[in-house]
Amino acid sequence: MADPGSVRVVDEEISLVPYYPNEETALPWYQDPDVCRQVDNIDYVYTSERLNAMYTYLNTHGACYYISYRGVLVGDVSLRNSGELAIVICREYQNRHIGRRCIRAMLDLAREKGMERVTANIYSFNTQSRNMFLSLGFRETGGEWFALEL
């Protein structure tokens, strides 16, 4: 679980804010059918219950942060204790290299935690995310899994 109050500054535009219950802001991200397909390969949107269960799991099994871009919360990023990374950025803020910068910061966090390897599960149709992870040095390890040795 992230240390409350331990905001991680990524750069002058982005900071990672430790998870706190904020359904009003986060639920709309997960009610975009395209985002749900990219992230979970599902054809339905999240309910409040599903959202809260996801965040509870991520926050108790690793570090979970909201992504603040120029003072606006635009998504979330997590690093599970198992080394699995996940990131979601709402559609309006995609294609601004926010994800790339956040994943770099999460790689730093993984190193701080002494992790030797991180992974990401990225669906084959999500070429945007696959390309971003590959550009950061991740390699396909089979199926829809990618890994980076730290």
Where are these regions (language model features)?
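Acyl-donor-binding surface of acyltransferase catalytic domains
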Residues: 1-10, 139-150
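Conserved acetyl-CoA pyrophosphate-binding loop and the N-cap/start of the following alpha-helix
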Residues: 93, 97-105
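Conserved active-site alpha-helix within GNAT-family acetyltransferase domains
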Residues: 100, 124-142
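Acetyl-CoA-dependent GNAT
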Residues: 41-92, 149
